[in-house]
């Protein structure tokens, strides 16, 4: 961390609900956690100053304000926006991490711009080729991490192994699992299943000798059954799965609402089952894990949903603080270093095996 006090730069501009909702979320996070941490609120001073005063945020001495005059909108092209809006709240927040003023950046803004800005400005860790976006997914018996859900749609097989390290460390922090069991998403659980990317990655996982607690392939049919703590996939597949899941939940809610409104008997039934619905909400960690970290960078970048409300912003701040306090970045670097040592050892063993084979062939000849 930049110092002994964890510091988060929060970009309060560019979200669907506007800066006020995010500022209220910051206030809720400060109210629920009285420990020693800092929040730098980044945004257009003319817009955010009245809101900070209205909601008594500046009375907390853990809050600082950083002025940024521009906003990257949701529909802007990421690279073009980065070049033309150099004083955007998002890029200024990332820069605060780059120079060491903050340890993490949290934003609800343009996902592409956040990923591009984070990757270009902060760079990937040594040994990590591409960052990956990880998120907590609710399961039938327990929650699990899915990674990657959108950062790298067409990765190399080696990157999927890297993603397992990133996801396992996030599972340790977010879910409290000491030795997360990792599965590789495929179209079946048999060793012969999967495309060339999955097949090659599957072989690499088997050869990594214990750095990752690898359990094998998992298919979509068993995704939510709790067999694995981390599910690894490419960013294209992960994004499709995530959006399909969100769409399915929304469809279920809409259909349920329509059916309830058909009869007063159904409405009465909902009142009777109110306790069950409250318990269902507790099992779905929408607010608690609303921030998805972009893992593998030299600095923590956390993406919250564009329509995140105040509770979800407070939850995203909470999980970001947990990542910082648990020294997740350092743990990732250590595991990546261990993995690379094993990879080099395996290569050397293979070269030695080939050399001996060649010598035996020459002797026989």
Language-model segments: what does each one mean?
Residues 1-49:
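N-terminal phosphate-binding or glycine-rich loops at protein starts, especially the Walker A/P-loop
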Residues 17-21, 33-40, 49, 58, ...:
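Glycine-rich phosphate/diphosphate-binding loop of Rossmann-like nucleotide-binding domains
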Residues 119-146, 227-231, 235-345, 352-353:
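Glycine-rich phosphate/nucleotide-binding loop
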């Amino acid at each position: 961390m930049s110092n002994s006090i964890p510091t988060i730069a929060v970009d309060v501009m560019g979200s669907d609900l506007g800066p006020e909702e995010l500022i209220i979320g910051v206030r809720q996070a400060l109210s629920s956690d009285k420990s020693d941490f800092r929040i730098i609120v980044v945004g257009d001073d003319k817009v955010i100053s009245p809101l900070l005063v209205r909601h008594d945020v500046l009375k907390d001495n853990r809050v600082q304000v950083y002025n940024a005059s521009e906003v990257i909108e949701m529909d802007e092209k990421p690279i073009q926006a980065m070049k033309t809006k150099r004083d955007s709240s998002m890029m200024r927040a990332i820069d605060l991490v780059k120079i060491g003023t903050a340890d993490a950046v949290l934003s609800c803004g343009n996902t592409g711009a956040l990923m591009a800005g984070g990757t270009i400005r902060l760079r990937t860790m040594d040994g990590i080729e591409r960052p990956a976006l990880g998120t907590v997914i609710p399961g039938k018996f327990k929650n699990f991490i899915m990674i990657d859900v959108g950062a790298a749609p067409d990765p190399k097989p080696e990157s999927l192994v890297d993603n397992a390290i990133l996801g396992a460390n996030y599972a340790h922090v977010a879910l409290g699992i000491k030795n997360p069991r990792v599965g590789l998403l495929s179209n079946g659980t048999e060793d012969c299943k999967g495309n060339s990317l999955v097949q090659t990655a599957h072989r690499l996982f088997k050869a990594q000798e214990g750095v990752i607690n690898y359990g094998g392939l998992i298919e979509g049919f068993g995704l939510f059954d709790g067999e694995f703590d981390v599910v690894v996939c490419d960013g294209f597949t992960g994004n499709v799965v995530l959006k399909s899941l969100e769409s399915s939940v929304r469809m279920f809610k809409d259909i349920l609402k329509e059916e309830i409104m058909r009869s007063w008997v159904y409405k009465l039934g909902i009142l009777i089952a109110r306790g069950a619905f409250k318990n269902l909400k507790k099992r779905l960690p929408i607010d608690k894990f609303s921030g998805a970290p972009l893992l593998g960078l030299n600095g923590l970048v956390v993406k919250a949903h564009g329509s995140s409300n105040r509770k979800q912003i407070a939850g995203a701040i909470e999980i970001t603080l947990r990542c910082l306090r648990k020294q997740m970045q350092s743990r990732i670097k250590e595991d990546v270093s261990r993995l690379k040592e094993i990879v080099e050892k395996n290569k050397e063993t293979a070269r030695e095996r080939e050399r001996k084979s060649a010598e035996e062939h020459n002797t026989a000849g």
